[in-house]
Amino acid sequence: MNTYHSPMSTGASAQSDVRDYEANLPVIPAQDFQLTDYGAVGDGVTDNTEMFRLAIASCAEAGGGRIVIPAGVWLTGPIVMRSRIELHVEAGALVTFSRDFDQYPLIASSFEGWQVVRCQSPIDGDQLEDIAITGEGIWDGGGEAWRPVKRSKMTTSQWNQLVASGGVVEQSGGEEKIWWPTTAALEGGTIANRLHEEQVRDVAAYEKVRDFLRPNMVSLRRCKRVLLDGPTFQNSPAWNLHPWASEHVTIRNVSVRNPWFSQNGDGLDIESCRHVVVENSVFDVGDDAICLKSGKDAEGRELGLPSEYITIRDCTVYHGHGGFVIGSEMSGGVRHVRVSDCTFIGTDIGLRFKSARGRGGVVEDIQIERIYMKDIIMEAISFSFFYANQEGSARGSDLSQEISEETPVFRDIRILDVVCAGADTALLVSGLPEQPLDGVIIQRYNVQARSGIQCAHAKHLHIAELQAQITEGPLVHLHQCKGAELESIQGKGADGRLLMVTGHESAGIVCREGDAETEGRQISVGPEVRSGVIIRR
């Protein structure tokens, strides 16, 4: 049996952890099937949909094997995977997917945390075992034919060129806002949402909004032993790679690319999966880069499939809304995650944890170490539980709501050995008053940022061996925090303050004596803060 072991656990006591983090590789017969033997032509014009189908059927009937796609430009409609099959794109091979929406039938699928009706994905598989996509070639999802584009993300010349290509423009307040590829795509959102809310499962009911239901590029659902090794996956209609409810998934040595302006242009969304390894891969995308999810709201909680035993290592992220992300759809839970040795350059946010009231779910036992960041546009590290635009989700309120199964829980998160050369904010925590962020450890963090640590509604927060250079405000601002501890802090705020504490519920803030009021660093408390809140040791 082929396995991969997480490197994060060491020592005699770690044996059970090593077994837990195993990811078994697929077992596929060592026999090749040449795509060209089935009449395929790599001229970029010939539609090879039937040739791919014949090759896959022949391979499956022979017990499985490897389908070899040689150098060339191979146009095709959707490819439906089967068990014990490897698609191998050789160097110089470019597989492009048809712009004809009618080639993509509507099917029951999954998107943004819900089980929904979508167009079939360019690469699609459901309830399969032992599948692989390998090689040094390129898969291009033809996403420009599907995706809406926001005017705010285009220069004037880019926008004019896009509008001149066809499609329709959505206007608001007399201004052009969004380009859509077709009128049906523009009008489809409202209808599709209504059908989903009414729990309409009849696929035929969605036919009139087909153009809106753009697919993820690679959708693998309820699969076991999956390997993606080597190719470039680019230009997806929606998310790029989406394993859902699958086990033993290995993704390595891949390049995942989407235009920076691509709507829902995520790189990799691991949703409700177990035993996953992602390593030695590069992401440059239009939304979150490497993201863990587990269903959305009541539907996700009812399904109850957490993402767990996940290892991510040695990856590089360039553009993306977040480098490594958990949420916001995490209602089934995320746990037992190990992330190490990753580099984020120019991402909007580095480490991003997001949720909202209504989600529910528990995120716990997350360990992240040796993360290197440069030129982060917003927060280097962010915890925001006010992500969704729904009642009670406005950031900054101290008003608690009743705790229920809809309340998300984030706890036991360890972030170690992080270097960030440039960010707007070193750390932002926006916890829920009724369910604060619990048990976060940040240790050995070297950061240069405009503002320092801004933390609201957290408990049992431990920050140690922080080296920070900031240019605005206090170094650390704790608001409505309980049981926070600062230790071995180097640096001070631009205003001379090491620490500012506000909020009448703040309590048990421990500041080591060696860190307090030295080198002109001051500690300040708001007038509402009770006496004795700051404990010096």
Predicted regions and their residues:
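Extracellular/periplasmic carbohydrate-active domains that bind, remodel
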Residues: 2-537
